[in-house]
Amino acid sequence: MAGSQIKVPLPKPPDSDSQRLNAFPVIMAQEGKGRLLRQIRLRKILSGDPSDQQITFVNTYGFIRATPETSEFISESSQQEVTPVVTACMLSFGAGPVLEDPQHMLKALDQTDIRVRKTASDKEQILFEINRIPNLFRHHQISADHLIQASSDKYVKAPAKLIAGVNYIYCVTFLSVTVCSASLKFRVARPLLAARSRLVRAVQMEVLLRVTCKKDSQMAKSMLNDPDGEGCIASVWFHLCNLCKGRNKLRSYDENYFASKCRKMNLTVSIGDMWGPTILVHAGGHIPTTAKPFFNSRGWVCHPIHQSSPSLAKTLWSSGCEIKAASAILQGSDYASLAKTDDIIYSKIKVDKDAANYKGVSWSPFRKSASMSNL
Protein backbone atom coordinates (compact mmCIF):
# COMPACT_ATOMS: atom_id res chain seq x y z
CA MET A 1 0.00 0.00 0.00
CA ALA A 2 1.11 3.57 -0.55
CA GLY A 3 2.69 5.24 2.44
CA SER A 4 2.78 8.82 3.63
CA GLN A 5 2.80 11.78 1.27
CA ILE A 6 5.59 14.32 1.01
CA LYS A 7 4.39 17.88 0.45
CA VAL A 8 6.24 21.12 -0.25
CA PRO A 9 4.38 24.24 1.08
CA LEU A 10 3.02 26.58 -1.58
CA PRO A 11 2.94 30.32 -0.77
CA LYS A 12 -0.43 31.90 -1.49
CA PRO A 13 -0.36 34.18 -4.57
CA PRO A 14 -1.22 37.86 -4.01
CA ASP A 15 -4.90 38.71 -4.20
CA SER A 16 -6.16 40.44 -7.32
CA ASP A 17 -9.53 41.28 -8.85
CA SER A 18 -8.36 39.54 -12.01
CA GLN A 19 -8.19 36.28 -10.06
CA ARG A 20 -11.97 36.24 -9.72
CA LEU A 21 -14.45 35.14 -12.32
CA ASN A 22 -17.65 36.10 -10.51
CA ALA A 23 -21.10 34.66 -11.04
CA PHE A 24 -23.62 36.22 -13.40
CA PRO A 25 -25.91 38.41 -11.25
CA VAL A 26 -29.60 37.51 -11.21
CA ILE A 27 -31.46 40.35 -12.96
CA MET A 28 -35.19 40.00 -13.38
CA ALA A 29 -37.05 41.76 -16.22
CA GLN A 30 -39.40 44.51 -14.95
CA GLU A 31 -42.10 43.92 -17.54
CA GLY A 32 -42.19 40.16 -17.14
CA LYS A 33 -42.94 38.42 -13.88
CA GLY A 34 -40.10 36.13 -12.93
CA ARG A 35 -38.26 36.46 -16.26
CA LEU A 36 -34.47 36.41 -16.14
CA LEU A 37 -32.70 38.90 -18.37
CA ARG A 38 -30.17 37.47 -20.79
CA GLN A 39 -26.61 38.42 -19.97
CA ILE A 40 -23.17 38.16 -21.48
CA ARG A 41 -19.82 37.80 -19.73
CA LEU A 42 -16.61 38.87 -21.48
CA ARG A 43 -13.11 37.84 -20.48
CA LYS A 44 -9.61 37.85 -21.99
CA ILE A 45 -6.96 35.15 -21.52
CA LEU A 46 -3.92 35.92 -23.68
CA SER A 47 -0.65 34.03 -24.05
CA GLY A 48 1.51 37.15 -23.94
CA ASP A 49 2.80 36.58 -27.48
CA PRO A 50 1.74 39.56 -29.68
CA SER A 51 2.08 37.41 -32.82
CA ASP A 52 -0.51 34.92 -31.54
CA GLN A 53 -3.88 35.17 -33.32
CA GLN A 54 -6.89 36.00 -31.15
CA ILE A 55 -10.07 33.90 -31.19
CA THR A 56 -13.24 33.73 -29.11
CA PHE A 57 -14.68 30.79 -27.21
CA VAL A 58 -18.45 31.04 -26.84
CA ASN A 59 -20.09 29.01 -24.10
CA THR A 60 -23.81 29.09 -23.29
CA TYR A 61 -25.85 28.36 -20.18
CA GLY A 62 -29.61 28.15 -20.10
CA PHE A 63 -32.61 25.95 -19.49
CA ILE A 64 -34.31 22.97 -21.08
CA ARG A 65 -38.06 23.31 -21.53
CA ALA A 66 -40.76 21.16 -23.05
CA THR A 67 -41.68 22.34 -26.55
CA PRO A 68 -45.00 24.27 -26.43
CA GLU A 69 -47.97 22.50 -28.00
CA THR A 70 -49.55 24.17 -31.03
CA SER A 71 -53.30 24.66 -31.36
CA GLU A 72 -55.39 24.46 -34.54
CA PHE A 73 -56.13 28.21 -34.65
CA ILE A 74 -53.74 31.01 -33.67
CA SER A 75 -54.58 34.75 -33.80
CA GLU A 76 -52.24 37.72 -33.72
CA SER A 77 -53.42 38.51 -30.19
CA SER A 78 -52.49 35.06 -28.93
CA GLN A 79 -49.64 35.12 -26.44
CA GLN A 80 -46.74 32.79 -27.04
CA GLU A 81 -46.93 29.90 -24.62
CA VAL A 82 -43.88 29.43 -22.42
CA THR A 83 -43.48 26.08 -20.73
CA PRO A 84 -41.88 25.66 -17.28
CA VAL A 85 -38.17 25.04 -16.86
CA VAL A 86 -37.28 21.35 -16.61
CA THR A 87 -33.57 21.64 -15.80
CA ALA A 88 -30.45 23.72 -16.43
CA CYS A 89 -28.09 22.99 -19.31
CA MET A 90 -24.73 23.99 -20.79
CA LEU A 91 -23.68 23.88 -24.45
CA SER A 92 -20.44 25.17 -25.93
CA PHE A 93 -20.56 26.93 -29.31
CA GLY A 94 -16.80 26.37 -29.57
CA ALA A 95 -14.06 28.55 -31.01
CA GLY A 96 -14.34 31.13 -33.77
CA PRO A 97 -13.25 34.62 -34.83
CA VAL A 98 -13.30 37.61 -32.49
CA LEU A 99 -16.81 39.03 -31.92
CA GLU A 100 -17.15 42.75 -31.33
CA ASP A 101 -20.71 43.74 -30.33
CA PRO A 102 -22.01 42.20 -27.06
CA GLN A 103 -25.53 43.61 -27.47
CA HIS A 104 -25.75 42.17 -30.97
CA MET A 105 -24.80 38.77 -29.57
CA LEU A 106 -27.60 38.88 -27.00
CA LYS A 107 -30.23 39.93 -29.55
CA ALA A 108 -29.07 37.23 -31.96
CA LEU A 109 -29.96 34.50 -29.46
CA ASP A 110 -33.63 34.84 -30.49
CA GLN A 111 -32.68 33.12 -33.75
CA THR A 112 -31.47 29.99 -31.95
CA ASP A 113 -33.39 26.73 -32.34
CA ILE A 114 -31.78 23.79 -30.54
CA ARG A 115 -33.78 20.63 -29.80
CA VAL A 116 -32.80 18.21 -27.04
CA ARG A 117 -33.32 14.44 -27.00
CA LYS A 118 -32.31 11.73 -24.59
CA THR A 119 -30.80 8.43 -25.70
CA ALA A 120 -28.45 5.74 -24.38
CA SER A 121 -25.57 3.46 -25.31
CA ASP A 122 -23.47 2.06 -22.47
CA LYS A 123 -24.67 5.11 -20.49
CA GLU A 124 -27.23 7.90 -20.82
CA GLN A 125 -26.58 10.46 -23.53
CA ILE A 126 -28.02 13.78 -24.67
CA LEU A 127 -28.43 14.65 -28.35
CA PHE A 128 -28.53 18.33 -29.32
CA GLU A 129 -30.14 18.90 -32.72
CA ILE A 130 -28.90 22.24 -34.10
CA ASN A 131 -31.76 23.39 -36.33
CA ARG A 132 -30.80 27.06 -36.45
CA ILE A 133 -28.11 29.30 -34.99
CA PRO A 134 -27.55 33.05 -35.47
CA ASN A 135 -25.44 34.10 -38.46
CA LEU A 136 -23.17 35.85 -35.97
CA PHE A 137 -21.83 32.43 -34.93
CA ARG A 138 -21.64 30.92 -38.43
CA HIS A 139 -17.83 30.71 -38.21
CA HIS A 140 -17.82 29.07 -34.79
CA GLN A 141 -17.47 25.34 -34.34
CA ILE A 142 -21.17 24.74 -33.66
CA SER A 143 -22.10 25.87 -37.19
CA ALA A 144 -20.44 22.72 -38.59
CA ASP A 145 -22.28 20.41 -36.21
CA HIS A 146 -25.88 19.55 -37.01
CA LEU A 147 -25.93 16.97 -34.22
CA ILE A 148 -23.97 17.06 -30.96
CA GLN A 149 -23.93 13.93 -28.82
CA ALA A 150 -22.66 14.07 -25.24
CA SER A 151 -22.86 12.30 -21.91
CA SER A 152 -26.00 13.51 -20.12
CA ASP A 153 -24.28 13.99 -16.75
CA LYS A 154 -21.78 16.45 -18.25
CA TYR A 155 -24.15 18.86 -20.01
CA VAL A 156 -27.48 18.60 -18.18
CA LYS A 157 -27.91 19.54 -14.52
CA ALA A 158 -30.62 16.97 -13.76
CA PRO A 159 -30.88 14.50 -16.67
CA ALA A 160 -33.26 12.29 -14.64
CA LYS A 161 -35.97 14.93 -15.21
CA LEU A 162 -36.00 14.32 -18.98
CA ILE A 163 -38.55 11.62 -19.82
CA ALA A 164 -39.68 9.77 -22.94
CA GLY A 165 -42.52 11.09 -25.08
CA VAL A 166 -41.75 14.79 -24.53
CA ASN A 167 -40.07 17.10 -27.04
CA TYR A 168 -37.54 19.44 -25.43
CA ILE A 169 -35.89 22.70 -26.50
CA TYR A 170 -32.77 24.43 -25.17
CA CYS A 171 -33.22 28.14 -24.33
CA VAL A 172 -29.96 30.11 -23.97
CA THR A 173 -29.98 32.69 -21.15
CA PHE A 174 -26.33 33.35 -20.30
CA LEU A 175 -23.55 33.82 -22.85
CA SER A 176 -19.91 33.52 -21.80
CA VAL A 177 -17.38 34.85 -24.33
CA THR A 178 -13.65 34.33 -23.76
CA VAL A 179 -11.22 36.18 -26.00
CA CYS A 180 -8.03 34.15 -25.99
CA SER A 181 -4.91 33.37 -27.98
CA ALA A 182 -5.29 30.64 -30.58
CA SER A 183 -2.37 28.76 -29.04
CA LEU A 184 -4.46 28.07 -25.92
CA LYS A 185 -6.90 25.86 -27.86
CA PHE A 186 -5.35 22.46 -27.19
CA ARG A 187 -6.71 19.34 -25.48
CA VAL A 188 -5.01 15.98 -25.10
CA ALA A 189 -6.61 13.04 -26.90
CA ARG A 190 -8.56 10.87 -24.45
CA PRO A 191 -6.79 7.58 -25.37
CA LEU A 192 -3.47 9.21 -24.47
CA LEU A 193 -4.83 10.41 -21.12
CA ALA A 194 -6.23 6.96 -20.33
CA ALA A 195 -3.13 4.95 -21.29
CA ARG A 196 -1.09 3.42 -18.44
CA SER A 197 2.31 1.75 -18.68
CA ARG A 198 4.90 0.30 -16.32
CA LEU A 199 7.57 2.02 -18.45
CA VAL A 200 6.63 5.54 -17.31
CA ARG A 201 5.65 7.47 -14.21
CA ALA A 202 2.40 9.43 -14.27
CA VAL A 203 2.22 13.09 -13.29
CA GLN A 204 -1.20 14.06 -11.97
CA MET A 205 -2.30 17.58 -11.11
CA GLU A 206 -4.56 18.48 -8.21
CA VAL A 207 -6.22 21.90 -8.26
CA LEU A 208 -7.89 23.13 -5.08
CA LEU A 209 -10.79 25.45 -5.85
CA ARG A 210 -12.39 27.80 -3.35
CA VAL A 211 -16.05 27.70 -4.38
CA THR A 212 -18.35 30.58 -3.52
CA CYS A 213 -21.17 29.11 -1.45
CA LYS A 214 -22.74 29.28 1.99
CA LYS A 215 -21.57 26.71 4.50
CA ASP A 216 -25.14 25.59 5.16
CA SER A 217 -25.94 25.16 1.46
CA GLN A 218 -26.61 21.78 -0.12
CA MET A 219 -23.50 21.91 -2.31
CA ALA A 220 -21.27 22.56 0.73
CA LYS A 221 -22.03 19.07 2.04
CA SER A 222 -19.99 17.52 -0.77
CA MET A 223 -16.95 19.79 -0.23
CA LEU A 224 -14.38 20.59 2.42
CA ASN A 225 -14.75 23.52 4.78
CA ASP A 226 -12.57 26.49 3.87
CA PRO A 227 -10.27 27.23 6.84
CA ASP A 228 -10.33 30.91 5.84
CA GLY A 229 -14.12 30.93 6.05
CA GLU A 230 -14.57 32.30 2.52
CA GLY A 231 -16.50 29.41 0.98
CA CYS A 232 -15.86 25.71 0.45
CA ILE A 233 -12.88 23.82 -0.95
CA ALA A 234 -13.17 21.32 -3.79
CA SER A 235 -10.37 19.16 -5.18
CA VAL A 236 -10.21 18.20 -8.85
CA TRP A 237 -7.56 15.91 -10.39
CA PHE A 238 -6.49 15.35 -13.96
CA HIS A 239 -3.65 13.54 -15.71
CA LEU A 240 -1.02 16.11 -16.67
CA CYS A 241 1.69 14.07 -18.43
CA ASN A 242 4.09 11.12 -18.17
CA LEU A 243 7.78 10.98 -17.26
CA CYS A 244 10.08 8.21 -18.42
CA LYS A 245 11.35 5.94 -15.65
CA GLY A 246 15.02 6.57 -14.99
CA ARG A 247 17.30 3.58 -15.55
CA ASN A 248 20.22 4.82 -13.48
CA LYS A 249 20.17 2.47 -10.49
CA LEU A 250 22.58 4.71 -8.57
CA ARG A 251 20.25 7.70 -8.72
CA SER A 252 17.43 8.37 -6.26
CA TYR A 253 14.18 9.20 -8.03
CA ASP A 254 12.65 10.92 -5.00
CA GLU A 255 10.85 14.18 -4.27
CA ASN A 256 13.99 16.21 -5.03
CA TYR A 257 14.27 14.64 -8.49
CA PHE A 258 10.58 15.27 -9.17
CA ALA A 259 10.74 18.85 -7.84
CA SER A 260 13.67 19.52 -10.17
CA LYS A 261 11.67 18.26 -13.18
CA CYS A 262 8.68 20.46 -12.24
CA ARG A 263 10.84 23.54 -11.67
CA LYS A 264 12.41 23.12 -15.10
CA MET A 265 8.95 22.84 -16.69
CA ASN A 266 7.93 26.12 -14.97
CA LEU A 267 4.24 25.17 -14.69
CA THR A 268 1.54 27.82 -14.34
CA VAL A 269 -2.16 27.10 -13.81
CA SER A 270 -5.21 29.29 -14.48
CA ILE A 271 -8.95 28.89 -15.06
CA GLY A 272 -11.32 30.06 -17.78
CA ASP A 273 -14.63 29.32 -19.47
CA MET A 274 -13.89 27.57 -22.75
CA TRP A 275 -15.43 24.08 -22.88
CA GLY A 276 -17.31 25.05 -19.77
CA PRO A 277 -15.17 25.71 -16.66
CA THR A 278 -11.67 24.78 -17.84
CA ILE A 279 -8.27 24.48 -16.15
CA LEU A 280 -5.41 25.83 -18.29
CA VAL A 281 -1.81 24.76 -17.70
CA HIS A 282 1.24 26.38 -19.26
CA ALA A 283 4.72 24.87 -19.25
CA GLY A 284 7.02 27.85 -19.77
CA GLY A 285 10.26 25.92 -19.43
CA HIS A 286 11.81 22.66 -20.58
CA ILE A 287 9.29 19.90 -21.31
CA PRO A 288 10.72 16.35 -21.07
CA THR A 289 10.41 14.27 -24.23
CA THR A 290 7.88 11.84 -22.72
CA ALA A 291 5.70 14.76 -21.60
CA LYS A 292 5.68 16.67 -24.92
CA PRO A 293 2.57 14.93 -26.40
CA PHE A 294 0.57 16.38 -23.49
CA PHE A 295 1.28 20.02 -24.46
CA ASN A 296 1.12 21.93 -27.73
CA SER A 297 4.14 23.54 -29.37
CA ARG A 298 3.78 26.63 -27.16
CA GLY A 299 3.45 24.68 -23.93
CA TRP A 300 -0.32 25.03 -23.38
CA VAL A 301 -2.97 22.45 -22.52
CA CYS A 302 -6.63 22.78 -21.49
CA HIS A 303 -8.48 20.38 -19.19
CA PRO A 304 -12.28 20.90 -19.09
CA ILE A 305 -13.44 20.19 -15.55
CA HIS A 306 -16.49 18.26 -16.77
CA GLN A 307 -14.18 15.57 -18.17
CA SER A 308 -12.64 14.91 -14.75
CA SER A 309 -15.49 15.80 -12.39
CA PRO A 310 -18.92 16.39 -14.01
CA SER A 311 -20.61 17.06 -10.66
CA LEU A 312 -18.12 19.79 -9.72
CA ALA A 313 -18.33 21.36 -13.19
CA LYS A 314 -22.12 21.62 -12.88
CA THR A 315 -21.72 23.23 -9.45
CA LEU A 316 -19.54 25.89 -11.07
CA TRP A 317 -22.29 26.75 -13.57
CA SER A 318 -24.01 28.66 -10.77
CA SER A 319 -21.12 29.44 -8.41
CA GLY A 320 -17.92 31.39 -8.82
CA CYS A 321 -14.60 29.90 -7.76
CA GLU A 322 -10.97 30.76 -7.20
CA ILE A 323 -7.85 28.64 -7.50
CA LYS A 324 -6.54 28.28 -3.96
CA ALA A 325 -3.56 26.05 -4.76
CA ALA A 326 -2.22 23.56 -7.29
CA SER A 327 0.06 20.56 -6.86
CA ALA A 328 1.71 18.05 -9.17
CA ILE A 329 1.76 14.44 -7.95
CA LEU A 330 4.17 11.77 -9.18
CA GLN A 331 2.67 8.27 -9.16
CA GLY A 332 3.24 4.91 -10.73
CA SER A 333 1.44 4.78 -14.06
CA ASP A 334 0.23 1.18 -14.02
CA TYR A 335 -2.01 0.17 -11.13
CA ALA A 336 0.46 -2.37 -9.72
CA SER A 337 3.14 0.31 -9.36
CA LEU A 338 0.62 2.81 -8.05
CA ALA A 339 -0.44 0.50 -5.22
CA LYS A 340 3.14 -0.18 -4.11
CA THR A 341 4.62 3.33 -4.17
CA ASP A 342 4.10 6.57 -2.28
CA ASP A 343 2.77 9.71 -3.95
CA ILE A 344 5.44 12.37 -4.35
CA ILE A 345 3.86 15.82 -4.29
CA TYR A 346 5.24 19.06 -5.72
CA SER A 347 3.14 22.00 -4.51
CA LYS A 348 5.05 24.92 -5.97
CA ILE A 349 2.86 25.25 -9.05
CA LYS A 350 2.37 28.89 -9.98
CA VAL A 351 -1.16 30.25 -10.03
CA ASP A 352 -1.74 32.91 -12.68
CA LYS A 353 -3.04 35.83 -10.61
CA ASP A 354 -4.71 37.34 -13.67
CA ALA A 355 -6.71 34.21 -14.52
CA ALA A 356 -7.16 32.25 -11.31
CA ASN A 357 -10.87 32.79 -10.81
CA TYR A 358 -14.06 31.60 -12.41
CA LYS A 359 -17.33 33.52 -12.30
CA GLY A 360 -20.33 31.26 -12.35
CA VAL A 361 -23.97 32.16 -12.74
CA SER A 362 -25.61 33.13 -9.46
CA TRP A 363 -28.81 31.19 -10.04
CA SER A 364 -29.74 27.76 -8.83
CA PRO A 365 -32.07 25.35 -10.66
CA PHE A 366 -33.14 24.10 -7.23
CA ARG A 367 -34.04 27.53 -5.80
CA LYS A 368 -37.82 27.80 -5.62
CA SER A 369 -37.94 31.54 -4.96
CA ALA A 370 -37.05 32.45 -8.56
CA SER A 371 -39.80 31.82 -11.08
CA MET A 372 -38.66 31.43 -14.68
CA SER A 373 -41.95 30.55 -16.29
CA ASN A 374 -41.88 33.18 -19.02
CA LEU A 375 -38.19 33.29 -19.86
From Swiss-Prot:
Entry similarity comment: Belongs to the morbillivirus/respirovirus/rubulavirus M protein family.
Record has Nucleus as a keyword: no
Main location: virion
Species annotation: Mumps virus (strain SBL-1) (MuV)
InterPro entries according to UniProt: Matrix_C, Matrix_N, Matrix_Paramyxo_C, Matrix_Paramyxo_N
UniProt key word Transmembrane helix: no
Gene3D superfamilies cross-referenced by the UniProt entry: Viral matrix protein, C-terminal domain, Viral matrix protein, N-terminal domain
Record GO terms (molecular function): structural constituent of virion
Origin: domain of life: Viruses
Role description: The M protein has a crucial role in virus assembly and interacts with the RNP complex as well as with the viral membrane.
Protein name (Swiss-Prot/TrEMBL): Matrix protein
Keywords, ordered alphabetically: Viral envelope protein, Viral matrix protein, Virion
Gene Ontology cellular component terms for the protein in this record: viral envelope
One of the GO biological process terms: virion assembly
Name of the gene: M
Compartments, as annotated in UniProt: Virion
